[in-house]
């Protein structure tokens, strides 16, 4: 069957699914933004979208929808040309709803089945908004702003035939009337690559090598920011380093903002928070390595003695489950997305998000007594194998789901 993937940064969440469906003989095509330079084994067509400046005062709560629907219009116009000029009609469209690209595709191809990747539905209460009072002052206006950001996300599913979310908690953020059409299948992790390796090493900039057995504490995120607990982790470090004089801390992540706002007058949170604790740190043992190639990330998870992962009630990072697959002892925040995967004392450890002293104590314990937590590391690996194995569990389920939406074979 013909399958059209739609994602402004393709392959995105379809990195493994699209090639797998192509390998199974399906005619796969992707529609993506003209600025997207990522490689793809699936043929790609590009639409041109020039974002217009939006008058916030005039649009008020409609600003987000204006921006997203504008992209939806650009995408739909490209889709219409694809239909008119090449007579292209997909059987299934699988698109991410986050940027509005799927909003009008049913107007171009009403006969196609539309599957929407439903990653997260913003809420004024009970999720990320208002969670961290240090950076978010609760107000009714804030609640309405958050609700206003959901307009394109809800509309995307209203016009869709089905939805897909990676976790139960993320699916639960959607209203009940929409939640019923969403199936939960995680993207999965490659457990054959992310596996324990006692021979692994990680090179530091000064030429030193970190090895399995070394006292290595790790923290990984796309960008270093409050949404992922960077401020809490950094505030916990002085006590950890004082208690563990041999510990080395490796921090992976960029100095931009993926979620929320940047500090006033600055591009990111890295130095803003670091400067708060710098005088209390042995900075020679804290290694900011920026964004690293995937092979280096894998090696780092393999040498990690303790891996800290914190998140607001928000989208769960793949990296947490990848760390578990590599056999790391993950110390995670006691927030709903993490609790869906980690049970305290079973396959990892949990700490209240805001309890800096508890983070210091638990991470110090994890560094000091690795043998005590070896059973947790083994069960973390089992969790990845039994629930999140991409090749054996997640990808087959996703393939089956997509294929179930296509034309049924004649009996």
Q: Where in the sequence are the language-model features?
A:
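Acceptor-binding helix/loop patch of EC 2.4 sugar-transfer enzymes
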Residues: 51-62, 112-151, 192, 196-201, ...
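A charged, aromatic-enriched C-terminal amphipathic alpha-helix characteristic of glycosyltransferases
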Residues: 70, 358, 371-403
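Carbohydrate-associated surface elements
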Residues: 169, 188
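Conserved donor-binding/catalytic core segment of Leloir-type glycosyltransferases
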Residues: 205-228, 234-239, 249-252
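Nucleotide-activated donor-binding/catalytic signature segment of Leloir-type glycosyltransferases, i.e.
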Residues: 257, 261-291, 295
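Aromatic "clamp/platform" in nucleotide-sugar-dependent glycosyltransferases that forms part
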Residues: 312
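Short hydrophobic beta-strand element within catalytic cores of glycosyltransferases
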Residues: 329-332
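Conserved acidic donor-binding segment of nucleotide-sugar-dependent glycosyltransferases
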Residues: 344-345, 349-356, 365-371
């Amino acid at each position: 069957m013909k399958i059209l993937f739609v994602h402004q940064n393709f392959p995105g969440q379809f990195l493994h699914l699209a090639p797998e469906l192509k390998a199974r003989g399906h005619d796969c095509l992707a529609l993506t933004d003209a600025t997207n330079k990522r490689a793809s084994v699936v043929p790609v067509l590009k639409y041109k979208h020039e974002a217009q400046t939006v008058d916030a005062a005039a649009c008020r709560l409609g600003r987000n929808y204006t921006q997203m629907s504008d992209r939806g219009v650009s995408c739909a116009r490209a889709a219409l040309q694809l239909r008119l000029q090449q007579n292209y009609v997909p059987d299934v469209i699988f698109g991410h709803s986050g940027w509005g690209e799927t909003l009008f595709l049913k107007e171009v191809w009403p006969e196609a089945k539309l599957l929407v990747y439903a990653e997260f539905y913003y809420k004024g209460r009970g999720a990320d908004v208002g969670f961290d009072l240090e950076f978010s002052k609760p107000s009714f206006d804030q609640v309405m702003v958050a609700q206003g950001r959901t307009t394109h996300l809800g509309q995307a599913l209203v016009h869709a035939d089905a939805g897909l979310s990676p976790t139960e908690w993320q699916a639960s953020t959607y209203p009940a009337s929409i939640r019923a059409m969403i199936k939960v299948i995680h993207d999965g992790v490659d457990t054959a690559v992310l596996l324990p390796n006692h021979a692994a090493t990680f090179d530091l900039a000064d030429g030193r090598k970190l090895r399995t057995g070394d006292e290595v504490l790790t923290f990984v995120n796309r960008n270093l920011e409050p949404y992922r607990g960077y401020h809490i982790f950094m505030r916990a470090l002085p006590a950890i380093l004082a208690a563990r004089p041999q510990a080395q801390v490796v921090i992976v992540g960029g100095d931009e903002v993926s979620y929320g706002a940047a500090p006033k007058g600055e591009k990111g949170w890295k130095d803003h928070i670091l400067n708060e604790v710098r005088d209390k740190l042995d900075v020679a043992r804290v290694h900011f390595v920026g964004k690293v190639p995937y092979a280096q990330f894998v090696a780092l998870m393999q040498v990690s003695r303790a891996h800290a992962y914190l998140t607001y009630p928000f989208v769960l990072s793949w990296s947490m489950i990848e760390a578990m697959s590599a056999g790391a002892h993950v110390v995670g925040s006691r927030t709903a997305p993490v609790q869906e995967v980690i049970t305290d004392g079973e396959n990892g450890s949990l700490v209240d998000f805001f309890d800096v002293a508890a983070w210091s104590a638990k991470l110090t314990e994890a560094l000091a007594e690795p043998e005590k937590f070896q059973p947790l590391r083994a069960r973390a690996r089992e969790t990845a194998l039994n629930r999140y194995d991409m090749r054996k569990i997640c990808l087959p389920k996703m393939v089956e789901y997509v294929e179930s939406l296509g034309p049924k074979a004649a009996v």
